[in-house]
Amino acid sequence: MAFLTIAPGAFAQAPAPASLSAEDKALVDKAVSYLQGLTEARGRFTQTDARGATSQGELFLKRPGKARFAYDPPSGLLVVSDGGAVAIQDTRLKTFDSYPLMATPLSLFLARTIRLDRGVQVTRVSRAADGFTITARDGKKQTAGQITLTFADNPMTLRGWSVTDAQGRTTQVRIDGLERVSGLDPGLFVLKDPRPKNVGRGKL
């Protein structure tokens, strides 16, 4: 999967959750409060896959549930979450796939109510000079997922995330210039299946 390894079951096994200190918990609460208040935003993203290949594009967020990742040419990739499903269209490869939002890492910060103490297990909180990271897994599934969210301090900003798949390959997404906006076009978060009804899944 080209984008963020979002296919169901794509997560690697995560370590057992660590005991969080009071300072760790305060940072988790700070991150949750920030994400909960991030209702509409746009910015640029750079994705780096396990082979080191990079691609860029424009990101739109409209919480709860909605996101759009429009990749720059020559990539033909477009990823859209409409609140219930994440659709992935590749016009170059002529493919179209769809997954339940709740089966993807995006659900961690697109949920209506973000909870990192229910159904999600925080395994690590790490500090840096200009921010911090939170590593978490989905505690609801038999296959534990692992995603690391990166935040900057002063001002508080989501910098990006990384996901490791079942083969131990990591895909990283860095966000630049994320800004709060309002009135995003609802059409940004609609991606209809272009395939004729008699065409099998994945092929246009």
Report residues per predicted region.
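Gly/Pro-enriched, hydrophobic low-complexity segments
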Residues: 117-119, 127-204
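Extracytoplasmic
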Residues: 38-40, 54-56, 62-66, 73-74, ...
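A short, Trp-centered hydrophobic/proline-enriched beta-strand micro-motif
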Residues: 33-50
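Flexible, surface-exposed loop/linker segments and immediately adjacent secondary-structure boundaries
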Residues: 93-140
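Boundary at the C-terminal end of the N-terminal hydrophobic targeting segment
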Residues: 10-18
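An acidic-aromatic
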Residues: 14, 58-108, 171, 177
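Solvent-exposed strand-loop boundary residues in beta-sheet-rich modules
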Residues: 49-51, 92, 167
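Bacterial N-terminal signal peptides
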Residues: 1-7
